């Protein structure tokens, strides 16, 4: 029983540990990137004003956006304005990130893991869409600066016009934004505003184009760049990042250690299980001889042995699954201790590998069948007459 309990427990623990590491690493990449594909072109700019004056107005020339419609059959897309150094009125020492979005398009394109917010993030987008001045801010504005729902917040970048918004919600997480707990000092300031509001105050500013793949591949963006001979200032391909993750030596090594560890335990436990039953059958040769002398057929003897195995092994497998689940619940969360808060980004979530667990059951089942075949063959090889004579002596 101990052999089977150890095998099942180690298998469950290894499967859930590997699946948790893999899935959370993928979720982190998708969250940090924000979308399947992100590109930004170089914008031509000209300064207007008196020479040598710092506050000269800068006018940007927007690249032709209509060419992106060539990819309408391959991806959904939206314009996203990102600024990383926005000042907050009344808090001169605070610098915030700003994300200007079109709420409907952003909801269709961005990647956001379920369960990170108290409500589905679509509810926050719906709230923003009701008011052009509606903004969402990180919880650091509430916890550190005392802002409340419905308060007005003013922000600006360098010498640009001040934008005033109304706070419609506080969020810890948002696609592409660093959450407060991942900040260097436990705080992170970011503002999510309507792109129309930002452009009305600041004019047309360089923006990024976020895309969501309609298929499994992102090859279309490479074909697009080659067709128009574009060298992007910023280029993010989440699919490529996920492939790089899976090819990472440390990542592969971790998965390899877990897999090899389970295989070694499976082999050792299977050999131990088989040795135990071989010795058990050899010591019960007289008992099997008596059963045959009582009129039991070989089929009935094998059926009895099968039922014995079924009940003993069934209890062991159930106990092993319970021990494995308990060990996963207690020790898998300790994985996050290996990462600093800045690397963690989003909370670690224990993942149950249903497919891997089913494979484990199949492997253990095959091992059990092989062992039963070997044991059945050994029982048939027992010389019943010799066993009975041994009993008479």
Residue ranges and their predicted role:
Residues 272-313:
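Interfacial "coupling" helices/loops that link adjacent transmembrane helices in transporter permeases
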Residues 1-8, 280, 297, 303-306, ...:
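N-terminal Sec/SRP start-transfer signal
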Residues 27-36, 41-152, 164-173, 186:
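Short beta-strand boundary microenvironments
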Residues 222-269, 280-283, 304:
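Peri-transmembrane interface segments
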Residues 32, 129, 173-216:
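Small-residue transmembrane helix packing/gating motifs
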Residues 6-36, 278, 327, 331-336:
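Alpha-helical transmembrane segments
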Residues 251, 257, 318-386:
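Short helix-loop junctions at transmembrane helix boundaries
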Residues 36-42, 141-142, 199-234:
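A short beta-strand structural signal in non-transmembrane regions
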């Amino acid at each position: 029983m101990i052999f089977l309990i150890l095998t099942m427990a180690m298998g469950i623990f290894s499967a859930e540990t590997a699946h948790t590491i893999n899935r959370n690493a993928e979720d982190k990449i998708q969250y940090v990137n924000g979308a399947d594909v992100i590109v930004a072109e170089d914008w031509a700019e000209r300064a207007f004003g008196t020479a040598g004056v710092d506050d000269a107005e800068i006018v940007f020339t927007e690249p032709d956006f209509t060419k992106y419609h060539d990819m309408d059959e391959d991806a959904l897309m939206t314009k996203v304005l990102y600024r990383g150094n926005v000042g907050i009125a009344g808090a001169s020492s605070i610098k915030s990130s700003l994300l200007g979005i079109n709420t409907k398009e952003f909801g269709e394109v961005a990647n956001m893991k379920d369960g990170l917010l108290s409500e589905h993030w679509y509810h926050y987008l719906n709230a923003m869409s009701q008011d052009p001045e509606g903004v969402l801010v990180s919880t650091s504005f509430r916890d550190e600066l005392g802002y409340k729902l419905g308060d007005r917040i003013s922000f600006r970048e360098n010498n640009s016009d001040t934008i005033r918004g109304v706070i419609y919600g506080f969020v810890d997480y948002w696609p592409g934004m660093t959450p407060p707990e991942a900040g260097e000092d436990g705080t992170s300031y970011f503002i999510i505003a309507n792109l129309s509001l930002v452009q009305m105050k600041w004019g047309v500013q360089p923006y990024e184009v976020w895309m969501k793949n309609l298929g499994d591949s992102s090859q279309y963006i490479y074909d697009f760049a080659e067709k128009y001979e574009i060298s992007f200032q910023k280029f993010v391909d989440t699919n490529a990042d996920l492939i790089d993750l899976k090819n990472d030596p440390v990542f592969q090594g971790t998965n390899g250690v877990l897999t090899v560890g389970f295989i070694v335990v499976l082999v050792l436990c299977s050999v131990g299980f088989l040795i135990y039953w071989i010795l058990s059958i050899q010591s019960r040769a007289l008992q099997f001889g008596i059963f045959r002398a009582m009129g039991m057929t070989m089929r009935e003897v094998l059926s009895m042995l099968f039922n014995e195995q079924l009940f003993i092994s069934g209890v062991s497998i159930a106990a092993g699954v319970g021990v494995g689940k308990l060990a996963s619940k207690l020790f898998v969360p300790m994985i996050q201790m290996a990462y600093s808060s800045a690397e963690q980004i989003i909370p670690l979530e224990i993942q149950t590998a249903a497919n891997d667990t089913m494979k484990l059951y199949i492997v253990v089942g095959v091992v059990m069948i092989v062992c039963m075949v070997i044991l059945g063959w050994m029982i048939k090889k027992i010389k019943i007459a010799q066993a009975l004579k041994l009993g008479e002596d």
